[in-house]
């Protein structure tokens, strides 16, 4: 049964003192990697030798899978891991459609070359945005402080910065906006698998 709307207590939700608890957050790790410029030359060299793989890319060039460069090994936050990587070179009006990285634990990207005025952000989608569509919208309408404090959005986009690296759960759906620049946007993406550990719960 649909209850009638009670307009007599409109201020109650605003005045009630609640603690917002970010339960089951999606963790995105961010760091910077110096001396990455040599990887740009490697990406261009491979493009002259390899045809593009077709995966999530809409246009652009996607290299073959290969070992993760030793340069990045010390930035992996795990003592044991296995992984592969690939280069992406996107030009004007090229990007990546929404996807995940199945059969992996973590995924990541290191931005190598980022043209100005590109617009090619990396967007992450809320893992349960469709089921929680109204919950997210209503909380953000009445309590925008929760949205800002806990990134309680339907989607969140990171602007790429050369030398910056993100790592995120491989199941977290994401996409890359079309590049609006005429210069190349180059990145190194990777997948990480980890050994099975004892389950930890509260």
Model-predicted regions and their roles:
Residues 112, 172, 192-194:
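Short beta-strand segments enriched in hydrophobic/aromatic residues
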Residues 85-87, 108-110, 188-192:
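A structural signal for short, well-ordered beta-strand segments
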Residues 90-165, 184, 197-202:
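Catalytic core of non-heme Fe(II) oxygenases with the double-stranded beta-helix
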Residues 86, 99-101, 174:
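Histidine-centered active-site/metal-ligand motif
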């Amino acid at each position: 049964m649909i209850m009638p709307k009670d307009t007599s207590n409109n201020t109650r939700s605003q005045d009630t003192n609640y603690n917002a608890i970010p339960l089951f957050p999606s963790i995105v790790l961010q760091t910077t990697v110096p001396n990455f410029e040599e990887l740009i030359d490697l990406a261009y060299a491979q493009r002259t030798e390899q045809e593009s793989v077709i995966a999530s890319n809409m246009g652009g060039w996607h290299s073959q899978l290969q070992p993760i460069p030793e340069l990045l090994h010390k930035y992996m936050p795990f003592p044991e891991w296995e992984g592969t990587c690939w280069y992406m070179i996107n030009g004007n009006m090229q990007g990546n459609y929404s996807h995940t990285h199945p059969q992996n634990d973590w995924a990541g990207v290191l931005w190598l070359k980022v043209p100005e005025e590109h617009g090619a952000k990396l967007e992450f989608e809320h893992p349960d945005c469709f089921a929680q569509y109204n919950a997210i919208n209503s909380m953000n309408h009445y309590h925008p402080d929760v949205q800002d404090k806990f990134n309680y959005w339907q989607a969140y986009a990171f602007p790429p910065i050369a030398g910056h690296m993100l790592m995120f759960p491989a199941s977290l759906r994401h996409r890359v906006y079309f590049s609006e620049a005429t210069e190349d946007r180059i990145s190194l993406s990777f997948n990480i698998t980890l050994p099975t550990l004892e389950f930890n719960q509260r």
